[in-house]
Amino acid sequence: MPDFGLYAYDGWRPTWPAAFIEWPDFGLPTDTDQATRLIVDAFDRAKSGQLVEVGCHAGNGRTGSIIACMVILAGIAPTDAIEWTREHYCWHAIDTKEQERWVEGFAPEPR
């Protein structure tokens, strides 16, 4: 069982602590600042050793976008992060060009 879940789909009903990003299918987060904060928080949890689950409805576009953002937080360049996510997670992760551009522009405040 995960220690924490970050979901871009409100249909999930986990029994563990979780956060939800309002993010329409094939679209972008409705609140970029909130999405960025939640992605950074989930990354920090994973980095500290917690088991973090990331998900959406199908597990491709939104989930892939979140994973690619976490790869960026790990120090990989945005374009390389998209490629890495498709190679290591799912070849069709990040559904749309709009989502690709969002990931490429992912830039949380320096910590």
Language model features with spans:
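A phosphate-binding catalytic loop at a beta-strand-loop-alpha-helix junction
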Residues: 50-72
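Charged phosphate-binding loop/patch that engages nucleotide di/tri-phosphates or the phosphate backbone
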Residues: 95-111
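A generic structural micro-environment signature
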Residues: 27-29, 66, 109
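A compact, surface-exposed functional segment
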Residues: 70-75, 107-109
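Cysteine-based protein phosphatase catalytic domain of the PTP/DSP
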Residues: 1-51, 72-74, 78-99
